[in-house]
Swiss-Prot record:
Protein's name in the database: Methionyl-tRNA formyltransferase
Residues annotated to bind (6S)-5,6,7,8-tetrahydrofolate: 111-114
Enzyme class: transferase
EC number(s) stated in the UniProt entry for this protein: 2.1.2.9
Keywords: Protein biosynthesis, Transferase
Domain of life of the organism encoding this protein: Bacteria
Underlying gene: fmt
Source organism of this protein record: Campylobacter jejuni subsp. doylei (strain ATCC BAA-1458 / RM4099 / 269.97)
A GO cellular component annotation in the UniProt record: cytosol
Known function: Attaches a formyl group to the free amino group of methionyl-tRNA(fMet). The formyl group appears to play a dual role in the initiator identity of N-formylmethionyl-tRNA by promoting its recognition by IF2 and preventing the misappropriation of this tRNA by the elongation apparatus.
Amino acid sequence: MKKIIFMGTPSYATCILKALVENENFKLVALFTQPDKAVGRKQILTPSDTKAFLSQNYPSIPIFTPSSLKDENIMRQIKDLNPDFIVVAAYGKILPKAILDLAPCVNLHASLLPKYRGASPIQSAILNKDEKSGVCTMLMEEGLDTGAILESLECDIKDKNSSEVFELLANLAAKLILSTLLNFDKITPKKQEESLATLCRKIKKEDGLINLQNARELYQKYLAFTPWPGVFLENGLKFLELELVDELKQNAKMGEILELEKESFLLACKQGVLRIKKLQESGKKALDGRTYLNGKRLKSEDSLC
């Protein structure tokens, strides 16, 4: 039975953690995750998704939430656990070389490397209109997502939002990590092709700011930034549900309401047309498109904003 230290934080990582802890070939000896964070208006201290899952279902397995992995006591604790593998999935911290040298460190990255190294591979793939994505296991080294690839699985992501793709890739990653660890000695690591490498940065709230220039680009932003940070106009109006109706039509009036429907309306971008199904003003409740227009006394040929 191989001893595993798992390092991960969000729900994506929990799916992988669950697969490992339930498999009879592995023994989870510890979880490393981010410290509890203050959440919401009341700033309630909340554990990470992985910590909540493990403490509720497997309370005997130790959980560590260090602010730094460079602490000598943390290094010693990891060494004393004597892991056969260290598995990392969306942990949120860089592993120092001293830890990388203790055991094979296998990272699960939510892209088909070397594309989209970095913090937002799923959102970046959607923004770039990729129809395929996937997950891969790689041997970690000091560079950011630069290690040799062990195995990968791909899937279709066309017209899926980030939330849906996260769930899809989490389930793929849970299968992939079992395959990689069980067959580790038989796998020949494959060096990444540096000429094909692309980088992606962390998503910020302001990335959700949109204009009505291009319907296709707005639609891809909507998919990429659901559920967070969402998409919103400069006046704070959020588009919660929308569909791409036409991506080529040139419209004379950007922001014109083209047609009212039962629970939605068609909106003109400078190029293309969107169906707005649900929207929300800042500080107010969400409304379907038609109800919102009725409340604002807006009709066909009026400007939304």
